[in-house]
From Swiss-Prot:
GO terms for molecular function: rRNA binding; structural constituent of ribosome. This is Small ribosomal subunit protein uS5. GO terms for cellular component: small ribosomal subunit. The N-terminal domain interacts with the head of the 30S subunit; the C-terminal domain interacts with the body and contacts protein S4. The interaction surface between S4 and S5 is involved in control of translational fidelity. Part of the 30S ribosomal subunit. Contacts proteins S4 and S8. The keyword RNA-binding applies. It comes from Clostridioides difficile (strain 630). With S4 and S12 plays an important role in translational accuracy. Coiled coil: none annotated. Residues 14-77 form the S5 DRBM domain.
């Protein structure tokens, strides 16, 4: 497995998308305590994307915490032209997603939370199909896990100790 270097979020021009904001409740002896949980995706539309979650008493604070968390969890997505190098499956909890490369001009064909991740990663032509849970947290994590497992031909050649030409025949 290739070791991934930590990414400095300060040097990237990151955009953020709020995927989900939920009101969560803690029931105590004196009644109910309400807080807000936010799920946010950040990315520079140039191969860097991350997800984060945050909780707070107010929605803006929860979003702010989620953005900070997302900046700590950035990954690099290998992009070939405007799409991904190969088909990949992501799995997290009950969330399963199939991400497939697409020809130029196709656009991003993906549902809900997965679309936010793929767009902020900088992918212009890609198809995705959710095969499991439609829970936003599981879908986003499955998408990130799938994108994180992508490898380019150069990566595979380096792992096998061969040249790219040998692999491609």
């Amino acid at each position: 497995m290739l070791r991934r270097k930590p990414i400095d979020a300060g040097q990237l021009d990151l955009q953020e998308k709020v995927v989900e904001v939920r009101r969560v409740t803690k029931v105590v002896k004196g009644g109910r305590n309400f807080r807000f949980a936010a799920l946010v995706v950040v990315g520079d539309e140039n191969g860097h994307v991350g997800i984060g979650a945050g909780k707070a008493m107010e929605v803006p604070d929860a979003i702010k915490k989620a953005v900070e968390d997302a900046k700590k969890n950035l990954i690099v997505v290998p992009i070939v032209g405007t799409t991904i190098p190969h088909e990949v499956r992501g799995h997290f909890g009950a969330g399963n997603i199939l991400i497939m490369p697409a020809v130029e001009g196709t656009g991003v064909i993906a549902g809900g939370p997965a679309r936010a991740v793929l767009e902020l990663a900088g992918l212009k032509d890609v198809r995705a199909k959710s095969l499991g849970s439609n829970n936003p947290r599981n879908m986003v994590n499955a998408t990130i896990e799938g994108l994180n497992s992508l490898k380019t031909v150069e990566d595979i050649a380096k792992l096998r100790g061969k040249k790219v030409e040998e692999l491609l025949g």
